[in-house]
Amino acid sequence: YRKAAEQEDEDAQCCLGFLYESGQGVEQSWEEAVRWYRAAAEQGLPRAQCNLAWCYEYGKGVPQDLGESYRLYRKAAEQGDARGLFCVARCFDYGRGVTQNSTEAVAWYQKAADAGSAAAMCDLGVCYERGEGVERDLSRAVSLYRQAAEAGNAAGQCNLGFLYESGEGVEQSWEEAVRWYRAAAEQGMPRAQCNLAWCYEYGKGVEQNWKRAVHWYRQAADQEDPRGMFCMGICCKYGRGVEQNWEEAVHWYRGAVDAGSAAAMCNLGVCYERGEGVERDAAEAARLYRQAAEREDAAAQCNLGYLYE
């Protein structure tokens, strides 16, 4: 790659940049990755333009510059590059490097979807589901999620599963919800893993199975997903699908608290109030209840009120 890159072969330059980014066969270096991405981008290679744009977006090897990131994504998009089109849409959707504009986001998502981007199909589906930048149309959202899901997009699979769960835009079907949650869960998506675990927990679309529920909650928890860690705490507290263990419950609640879960703050507060899995500490319980209460957790608000009483 280096020999070809030094002879200004843009594909080789981009590939060499990726090797420096990933540290494969060379010492990892964002600065060298940027150097070679830039060389290929300046020759007009869309893939390199997108890779360099990403470096500017997240400040890897260069100071973060969202405006420059957008400019580079736009260059790739103007060549019809699916990733470039999708990333321009995201810039407009979230106001990164440009003024937020949902209508513009929809237009670019549509172009990216037409170019075959499954991620764009999913995000365009979200726009139709929520009525952001376009009139709300659940049937269209379902169609787009299905296209994305069948192309293997995990978010599209999970979103389609949720519409089957809720019966919005499609006939309600727990079996179809489980089918699509499983597809996304097997790709490692924490939200889908938790949704599938919940189906096993309550026997929705599958036979109730606590061990399978714990399996999927743990998969999400091991990725530090707040809901997954909170639900593992519940399972350990009550011995659902695992042996009852207060210390393990506290461990998972604490992880979920660190990830911002108000429900976990409340439940960990209960552990401190009662001395379950930890030494009893009313002051720590009150502190946790207050944190959760300030995040509008109703149970914590009630528990905090009781302590004041």
Model regions and ranges:
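Low-complexity/repetitive intrinsically disordered segments
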Residues: 1-7, 298-309
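Short helix-capping/linker turns of helical repeat alpha-solenoids
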Residues: 6-9, 22-24, 29, 37, ...
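Hydrophobic face of amphipathic alpha-helices that form TPR/SEL1-like repeat modules
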Residues: 15-22, 51-58, 87-94, 123-130, ...
